[in-house]
UniProtKB/Swiss-Prot annotation:
UniProt GO BP: translation
Keyword Isomerase: no
Recorded GO CC terms: cytosolic large ribosomal subunit
Annotated family: Belongs to the bacterial ribosomal protein bL28 family.
Name of the protein this chain belongs to: Large ribosomal subunit protein bL28
Highest taxon in the source lineage: Bacteria
Record key words, sorted: Ribonucleoprotein, Ribosomal protein
One MF term in the entry's GO annotations: structural constituent of ribosome
One Pfam family named in its UniProt record: Ribosomal_L28
Amino acid sequence: MSRVCQVTGKGPVTGNNISHAHNKTRRRFLPNLQHHRFWVESEKRFVRLRVSAKGMRIIDKRGIEAVLADLRARGEKF
């Protein structure tokens, strides 16, 4: 399973660990992904999504119905 938010599309990015001596080693910054169940009132069921913390805030703001409509338009499975 890929580490990508289903709502925002955020995935891992690469960068450097920098030590006190300023030695650089490559690393990955991973998104804050959570499996979360959202209640969809119109369908009378829970939908389980893998979303980032930012994705949860978007769902809080726009509503789960609007976000699911966008996911269905993109052909996303959930």
